Design a protein with these regions (language model features):
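Amphipathic, small/basic residue-rich leader segments at the start of a protein or domain
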Residues: 1-126, 150, 579-591
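Alpha-helix capping/hinge segments and adjacent helical runs
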Residues: 4-7, 91, 257, 363, ...
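Internal maturation/activation junctions in enzymes
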Residues: 67, 80, 128-132, 143-185, ...
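C-terminal amphipathic alpha-helical interaction region
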Residues: 101, 113, 455, 471-591
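A glycine-rich, basic-preceded beta-loop-alpha segment at the flavin cofactor/substrate interface
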Residues: 198-200, 236-249, 254, 261-292, ...
Length: 591
């Protein structure tokens, strides 16, 4: 009666890497020769061993103990600091980092493969290196040569960690309202004053220094988001080692991810350094935010995978009632619950979302590689356009479905799923934050429909639908999947029609975009997973593991027959328009 032990799903990961997405051909085309098949295999094997043996055993205990706060000092749960030291010593922190600053220079996709295993084994622990990688990407993209030399080496080595400090008590989504101020100093630095809340890994004992990336406004800044600048504010000064004027005021007591320190940070004239251009800080921060949003989307997959592993074991062991078609285990008091159709429904839903979301993660990861490594400018731009389109979908669709998966995992356990000792409720609690932070899923949906799709006059959407159309044309006469290909092709066409419909309505009433956004995003996500499930099913037919292939084909069929029909409900909601949402006056919601 303990939390399920995580086992990295290496067979499925290898299937995607080798059979579906051809990572090796992908790396060769990009000139990433260091990412050899042997290197990829070693990262999978050794990464799995570290996550299974070091991180997974700390997941339950970390949740039970949580972080400790004492007069501004935060201590992580027992074993966390030692695990981070092992992680750093093993070179894992710099797998995809720039070799110029001590990294291994492997493609971003391999970093995400590793991140999945970390997040599945221990979501809270994974927050500490995850936020650091985001800070590294922002400094690498926008920092001066001196800033890169000062900070990236230590961050890459894991000697220092990083944060991003956006939210204040009065503003989360609307960053234009921030009150934190940065006053220029004679030496070219800035005195940063203000308070930030909900800062993940804002204070802890796992690294010698913490490098905060802080949004603040200059004294003469324009109003709103056009007046936001970004500053590097170290906990300890990089040159002298003296403590900077930034301190943790408290840590939050949360529903989940309890072993991740969520801090209130007070900046009292702390010495900071402008990164990027003045008043262009949001552009710099979005480099970090996009990295974080992909990582957050993956948290839906990670908690879902851990929940699924617990649920399938329990469903095979738990004996309750007899099968409706006759006893399946007549020598036992009852049949295992996995024989019951409703338990199968839940398990297959979990499996379909997990494996579909993993495919979406790997598909997106390859685009990251192309955007960073391709020598072809047009190819890089195409990849960046697809990334812009897919990022809000990855973040929102994967976290919403991941939450559904963890709820199913609890339900498979029945009453035991609600009891702490089994560990299933922790996974649901840990998963619940993912649709909220790094931009709520409602905001992701608004970004997708309003900015990415309609804002590009449909260009970004067409970039993806062309891929699907080409795939459908190539497989229209597939002997086994012809009907599913036709279903996907029809939805792919309707996707554009629905988009035009919303765009026309929005010209008359902008509320139409906000009213349609969430359902539009979910509609989009289901179509994208349908495309990926067909790719997996076709690839599985040639797989040498017959039982694995059968499971893929059966899950694809389940997805098309049981989950993809949800698109009809989402489309109907989009077409219903805004009036039924907005006609009721705000006063009518009063108690």
């Amino acid at each position: 009666m303990t939390m399920p032990e995580y086992k990295a799903p290496l067979r499925d990961m290898r299937f995607l890497i080798d059979n579906v997405f051809d990572f090796h051909g992908h790396y060769a085309a990009l000139g990433a020769t260091d990412a050899s098949p042997d290197m990829v295999s070693a990262i999978l094997e050794e990464g799995a061993r570290f996550c299974e043996n070091v991180l997974s055993p700390l997941n339950r205990s970390g949740d039970e103990e949580g972080c400790h706060f004492d007069n501004g000092v935060v201590t992580t749960p027992k074993g966390f600091k030692e695990a981070f030291a092992q992680y750093v010593e093993g070179g894992w922190h710099g797998v995809a980092a720039d070799p110029a600053y001590g990294g291994q220079g492997l493609p971003q996709s391999l970093g995400l493969v590793l991140s999945e295993m970390i997040g599945s084994s221990n979501t809270s622990w994974g927050m500490y290196p995850g936020l650091t990688h985001g800070a590294m990407s922002a400094i690498h993209a926008h920092g001066t040569p001196e800033q890169k030399d000062t900070f990236l080496g230590k961050l890459t080595a894991g000697e220092w960690t990083g944060t991003m400090c956006l939210t204040e008590a009065h503003c989360g989504t609307d960053l234009g309202l921030i009150k934190t101020r940065a006053v220029p100093q004679a030496d070219g630095s800035y005195a940063v004053t203000g308070s930030k809340i909900f800062i993940s890994a804002g204070e802890h004992d796992m690294s010698a220094n913490i490098i905060h990336l802080v949004l603040a406004k200059l004294p003469d800044a324009p109003a709103g988001t056009k007046g936001i600048s970004l500053f590097i504010v170290p906990k300890f000064h990089a040159d002298s080692g003296e403590r900077n004027a930034v301190h943790c005021g408290s840590i939050e007591h949360k529903m989940g991810i309890k072993a991740s320190a969520t801090c209130v940070l007070n900046f009292d004239g702390a010495k900071g350094f402008l990164i990027g251009e003045a008043n262009k800080g949001l552009n710099c921060m979005f480099t970090m935010m996009n990295h974080a949003r992909l990582g957050t989307g993956m948290q839906g997959l990670c908690n879902g995978e851990a929940s699924f592993q617990g649920a399938i074991k329990y469903a095979n062991d738990r004996l309750q009632m007899r099968s409706l078609t006759g006893a399946k285990a007549p020598d036992k008091a009852a049949d295992p619950i996995i024989v019951h159709p409703d338990v199968r429904r839940m398990l297959l839903t979990m499996k379909a979302f997990n494996e579909g979301n993993r495919a979406l993660t790997y598909f997106t990861a390859q685009l990251l590689d192309t955007a960073h490594l391709s020598s072809d400018a047009a190819q890089r731009q195409d990849a960046e356009d697809l990334l812009a389109f897919l990022t809000p979908i990855c973040k929102a669709f994967m976290t919403d479905t991941g939450l559904e998966v963890t709820n199913h995992g609890m339900q498979v356990f029945g009453g035991h799923g609600y009891i702490r000792e089994w560990g299933m409720e922790q996974l649901a609690r840990d998963a619940r934050i993912a649709p909220i932070y790094e931009g709520t899923n409602g905001i992701q949906a608004l970004d997708l429909l309003g900015r990415k799709v309609l804002g590009s006059q449909g260009k970004l959407l067409r970039g993806f639908t062309k891929i699907v159309h080409k795939f459908c044309a190539a497989n229209a006469e597939h002997p086994q999947f012809k009907a599913f290909v036709a279903q996907l092709n029809q939805l792919n066409g309707e996707w554009g029609e629905l988009t035009t419909q919303v765009g026309m309505a929005a010209m008359k009433n902008p509320d139409e975009v906000g009213a349609a956004a969430v359902d539009y995003l979910m509609y989009s996500g289901y179509i994208i997973l349908a495309y990926l499930w067909l790719r997996m099913a076709i690839a599985a037919q040639a797989h040498d593991d017959v039982e694995f292939a059968k499971a893929k084909l059966a899950t694809c069929e389940f997805y098309f027959k049981r989950l993809l029909p949800r698109t009809a409900a989402h489309r109907a909601a989009v077409e219903a328009g805004s009036e039924c949402l907005m006609s009721l006056p705000a006063e009518a919601f009063a108690l």
